[in-house]
Amino acid sequence: MLKIYNTLSGKKEIFKPIEEGKVGMYVCGNTVYDFCHIGHARAMISFDVISRFIRHLGYELNYVRNITDVDDKIIKRAEENNESTQSLTERMIAAQREDELRLGNKMPDREPKATEFMQEIIDMVQVLIDKGFAYQGTSGDVYYRATKFKDYGKLNNRKLEDMLAGARIDVEVAKEHPADFVLWKQAKAGEVSWSSPWGEGRPGWHIECSAMSTNCLGSHFDIHGGGPDLKFPHHENEIAQSEAATGKEYVNYWMHCGAVRVNNEKMSKSLGNFFTVRDVLAKFNPEVVRYLMVSSQYRSAIDYSDQSLLEAKVALERLYTALRQQQVAESFEPTVFTERFEEAMKDDFNTAVAVSVLFELVRELNKAKTEDANKASLLAAELRSLAELLGLLYQDPEYFLQNSTVSEGLGEVAIQALIDERTQARKDKNFARSDEIRDELASQGIELLDSREGTTWTRS
């Protein structure tokens, strides 16, 4: 029984699809004016894992993730680069796909671009005007009447006035109310634009997603996801637009992944702690980055640092070491490990617990290597199968172990984790694994000193 934390209700709910056996999921994608940063990677990997597990449960999933390819930021960046908006967005879309493939993601079933749905956007704006939910201001821009939608604020469980108090709202004389937001912008000279009943212009950000999602998945669909910063105003505005236009409930389950913090601070260019995926992959194996992202439950915040990636590298090496020179059966009968892994994933896609199950499986696998070769090969197959649902352990073990190193040494947390594992291995009389860990630490310049009180270490 799959349970999903629904932002709309603020609690975990049993998942019940609108149509039995089928799931429609829309995730807000990137505005393609720059390279993907690690916050984008967190969202993309989270929903990739979610989509994998939904399919694993036997559902026919239609996973749609949009591309925002018309926006003020795109226009500004194209001007700075002295290139067309189309040239810029095509370059950034290609770069994003390259980054995702390196991170081990599978592509969504459909990636609609805003520029491909211009007529559908215009049609939805017109419906909102006809129903009295939108109006053309004195500036010529078209705005949504936020006060007319009685459920405005339901996603964030706040009243309109409260949300305005804590939000950055553009004060424009052309608007009837400070909370009203733009649906269609009048074009400025030289900007990319489209013809509409309200003159040459382009759509606002929020209406793009309403039009694309409802055209790709229908006016009422199962899951809508995105990053933590999209709850307000973007997703709140999507609900207001879509439900006003269609007269139906828009989405059943709203999912938001956690933020990525850098050295326990918010990631921002002004703080100088902003990292693109490409920055990170220049130093770390892509699978190490992926492991860091899935080692926490998708709603939890992740603290990104070189140290956290080094610890992720050590953990992933432990998994790959278990598969090194290990026969892998072609098929296997699921054991208690599969049961516990699935139980964790059914509990709001708890990848943190699922990953811990992989390490329990590895301990059993290492023990079986010296006791029962056939059992070891079956457990290795089960490990590969479960890890694939997280997008892990897809490389050849020897290749990964030879290519996962970075210039920095192991941090204290990573060293202690290995020492703790070695202590447990010795208690279990798994001396082969104990020796492996000692050798692994020695290769990193770490010397272990065993005594009655325990194990200490020094750097050689």
Curated annotation (Swiss-Prot):
Zn(2+) binds at residues 28, 209, 234, 238. GO terms for biological process: cysteinyl-tRNA aminoacylation. Keywords: Aminoacyl-tRNA synthetase, ATP-binding, Cytoplasm, Ligase, Metal-binding, Nucleotide-binding, Protein biosynthesis, Zinc. A motif ('KMSKS' region) lies at residues 266-270. It is found in: Cytoplasm. The keyword Zinc applies. It is an enzyme of class 6 (ligase). Its cofactor is Zn(2+). A motif ('HIGH' region) lies at residues 30-40. Its main location: cytoplasm. One of its GO terms (cellular component) is cytosol. GO terms for molecular function: ATP binding; cysteine-tRNA ligase activity; zinc ion binding. Binds 1 zinc ion per subunit. Its EC number is 6.1.1.16. InterPro entries: Cys-tRNA-ligase, Cys-tRNA-synt_Ia_DALR, Cys-tRNA/MSH_ligase, CysS_C, Rossmann-like_a/b/a_fold, tRNA-synt_1_cat_dom, tRNAsynth_Ia_anticodon-bd. It catalyses: tRNA(Cys) + L-cysteine + ATP = L-cysteinyl-tRNA(Cys) + AMP + diphosphate. The keyword Lyase does not apply. ATP binds at residue 269. HAMAP family: Cys_tRNA_synth (MF_00041). Monomer. Belongs to the class-I aminoacyl-tRNA synthetase family. This is Cysteine--tRNA ligase.
